[in-house]
């Protein structure tokens, strides 16, 4: 099963683009016969480590929006435990959640991050042209994810 963890706030303009992208990604992956579960949150929480470490999870994709220049495109980036630094603060990164999953539950599936470019994070529910354009790349990234799920050697190298 592919676990998609979407992070964002639909009331902060482009910050909600990650949530929309993740929902569309879920449907695109299902259309490619991938079993998917999607979790949407405002921020990453330590409790998500248990979901990540579940036996049925083959891989995890984190989706979030970041401040970017107009014209930037979303990309699938591998995550590594090597880049994780334990945190006791109020902000967790995807890599730290993977580290928690490994340390607490002894299971850490391959993981990637998709960052959606955004330029407007003011209060509101409309998306900028930059964020809207990013949503058009869902099917391409769904195919990239599916290809990685089908190649366990590639998954092992990324962690």
What are these regions (language model features)?
Residues 1-116, 125-137, 143-152, 156-159:
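N-terminal catalytic or cofactor-binding beta/alpha core of small enzyme domains
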Residues 118-120:
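Short, internal active-site loops enriched in acidic
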């Amino acid at each position: 099963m592919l676990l998609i963890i979407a992070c964002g706030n639909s009331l902060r303009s482009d910050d909600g683009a990650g949530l929309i992208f993740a929902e569309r990604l879920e449907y695109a992956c299902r259309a490619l016969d991938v079993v998917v579960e999607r979790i949407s949150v405002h921020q990453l929480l330590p409790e998500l480590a248990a979901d990540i470490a579940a036996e049925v999870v083959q891989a995890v994709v984190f989706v979030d929006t970041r401040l970017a220049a107009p014209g930037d495109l979303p990309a699938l980036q591998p995550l590594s435990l090597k880049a994780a630094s334990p945190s006791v603060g109020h902000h967790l990164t995807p890599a730290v959640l993977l580290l928690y999953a490994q340390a607490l539950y002894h299971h850490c599936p391959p993981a990637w991050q998709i960052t959606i470019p955004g330029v407007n994070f003011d209060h509101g529910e409309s998306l900028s042209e930059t964020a809207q354009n990013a949503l058009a790349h869902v099917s391409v990234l769904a195919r990239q994810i599916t290809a990685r799920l089908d190649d366990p050697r590639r998954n092992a190298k990324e962690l």
